[in-house]
Amino acid sequence: MGKSNFKSFITIVFMKLFLLVSTLFLANIVTPFIACAQSLPVDAVYGPELEGYSYPYPIEYFEFKSQGVDMRMAYMDIRPKSANGTTIVLLHGKNFCAATWVGTAQFLVEHGYRVIAPDQIGFCKSTKPEKYQYTFQQLGVNTKALLDHLGVSHAVMMGHSTGGMLAIRYALMYPEKVKQLVLVNPVGLEDWKAKGIPYPTVDQWYQRELGTNAGRVRNYERSTYYVGQWREEFEAPVQMYAGMYQGPGREIVAWNSALIYDMIFTQPIFYELEQLKVPTLLLIGTKDTTAIAKDFAPTEIRPLLGNYSQLGKAAAKKIPQATLIEFDNLGHAPQIQDPIIFNTALLQGIEGSN
């Protein structure tokens, strides 16, 4: 065999091995989503705190008092078999729960990271109070209380979507406790009010949220999160989220959702990015078009909203210690849409900062 043929042979073997490993790895990551989607009944009723839905890892509860109300914050604390000494806190988005981090959490744990994934107050398996003054500062205080309870004094804070806004606020409040900030398509990188969206009242949000069902959530996520794609593993998070809005207790879910939307819309983080003092990794799917209250916006300005191919770059210029990684063919949830590409970039970005 000549040298050129030998090189070609080695190249082909290497490519086949790479594809095999990649396929097996992808199967390992998305299998929990597919298995869950296959086992979930359509339009099931899961209760206002997802009482009827099982998470992929054991759930624990942190009990505390906030604004005079007894609270329970659900969380998963997943420890690796061989720890590398770093804890990563995963902060979910508005239409997500801690459970939707399952693929990322599994990947990180396999690489030696301790993973803590809470459901914020007002979300998923956590308390949904009848009255609560929602601010990102309050959610930051709650998250710090949880981490203090768990003895975690220094962590990588990783937030997706609305969780990205919370992660930024947390880093601004407690920079000494943040080893690194990881932002996955965070919202709040633009001021929707300043761009011309009229203020939606809490009552308007509430009426809209009462109409939440799996079909509506699926259609929105298909167009915004997954660039028109839909695969089997995308369905489980839809059924989980929509299941809170079915049956008894749906009103308190919708009411808390309305209050949270009001918080997101009125508290953009855009103006404070320059104040961040921690290393920041931006992981941005550039096909994302998410903009809070876009459906309330005048038709002529909607194309100007949620342009993440521009928002990611603009944020990276504002943040002093920013590293930007863009995924050109992915949308709002790159960690679910393409876990292989996402996790590879994530691991390089985290380990490269150490």
Region annotations inferred by a language model:
Residues 168, 172, 181-211:
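Flexible "cap/lid" loop of the alpha/beta hydrolase fold
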Residues 33, 37-64:
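An N-terminal hydrophobic leader/cap segment in hydrolases
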Residues 309-354:
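Catalytic active-site module of serine/aspartate enzymes centered on a nucleophile-bearing elbow/loop
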Residues 67, 71, 78-125, 345:
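Conserved HGGG/HGGXW glycine-rich cap/lid loop of the alpha/beta-hydrolase fold
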Residues 213-273:
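Conserved alpha/beta-hydrolase catalytic His-Asp/Glu region
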Residues 246-312, 317:
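Conserved serine/cysteine hydrolase catalytic core
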Residues 119, 184-187, 283:
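Alpha/beta-hydrolase-fold catalytic nucleophile elbow
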Residues 63-69, 76-81, 110, 120-158, ...:
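Active-site loop/oxyanion-hole signature of alpha/beta-hydrolase fold enzymes
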